[in-house]
Regions:
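A contiguous, mid-domain pocket- or channel-lining segment that forms the substrate-recognition surface
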Residues: 182-186, 193, 205, 211
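Short internal beta-strands
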Residues: 92-94, 191-196
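N-terminal amphipathic, basic-rich helices that act as targeting or association modules
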Residues: 20-104
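Long, well-ordered, tryptophan-enriched scaffold segments
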Residues: 198-218
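Basic polycationic patches enriched in arginine
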Residues: 10-15, 21-22
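Cofactor-binding active-site loop characterized by glycine-rich and histidine/acidic residues
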Residues: 66-187
């Protein structure tokens, strides 16, 4: 078994249907855990994504937050929680500033749709909030190395759950991410890396790795 590396492309520009202040929500109020979306049809997932997008914009307009990174991972987060079985399967979001959709689907939707609860959750993953948040994260490039640790612990315990690291292309060049990739390749075990290749980072990406990613993209 080898580590699996998946790359998702840049999200299209977002369109919001109807008013941001329409009666919330059709689906979000009914979601208390990821199991609630497992049976959704494609159209239901699209409607859920629209609700999540509108809720993010509404909430952020009141209290601030990381709007761009979260708008860009809504569909990817719905897909992750549809395919995998959290919290048995472990998901680690790099930096974790893009965890708002994840929190919406893991029992914390009220913090995004009810103004009275907007400040009930932090802007990053927090193990104090939910068993779905494996680590308290706020730094870049840590997800892959954390995932290798979880995968090693799983293997030593004889378990079979999936371990998923979700990382952006900007974070991928960080030293700890490169060390994590090196260790993951040596482990030859079930470890899934999802690359959010959205072409956004604090500074422009340079180097041989990004030249390779451009070739894959093209």
């Amino acid at each position: 078994m080898y580590p699996c590396f998946l790359m998702i492309g840049r999200a299209e520009r977002f369109r919001i249907s109807g008013s941001f202040r329409r009666a919330f929500p059709l689906y979000l109020e009914q979601i208390h855990s990821p199991s609630d979306i497992k049976a959704y049809m494609a159209e239901q997932r699209r409607a859920l994504a629209e609700e999540m997008r509108a809720a993010l914009i509404e909430r952020t307009s009141h209290i601030g937050g990381h709007i761009g990174p979260n708008l860009g991972v809504i569909e990817a987060t719905i897909a992750l929680h549809t395919v995998f079985d959290a919290p048995t399967d472990k998901m680690i979001f790099d930096v974790s500033h893009q965890c708002y959709p994840h929190k919406m689907l893991t029992g914390r939707a009220a913090a995004y749709i009810d103004a009275a609860h907007y400040r009930d959750v932090s802007g990053f993953t927090s193990s104090e909030e939910s068993v779905h948040d494996i680590f308290n994260i706020g730094h870049t490039s840590t997800s892959i190395s954390l995932a290798t640790g979880l995968a090693k612990a799983r293997d030593l315990a004889g378990r079979r759950e999936n371990v998923i690291a979700f990382i952006g292309d900007g974070s991928l060049s960080g030293g700890e991410a490169l060390e994590g990739l090196n260790v993951a390749g040596e482990m030859q075990t079930n470890l899934i890396i999802v690359l959010n290749d959205n072409d956004w980072s604090i500074a422009e990406n340079h180097g041989g790795m990004y030249a390779m990613l451009r070739r894959l993209r093209e």
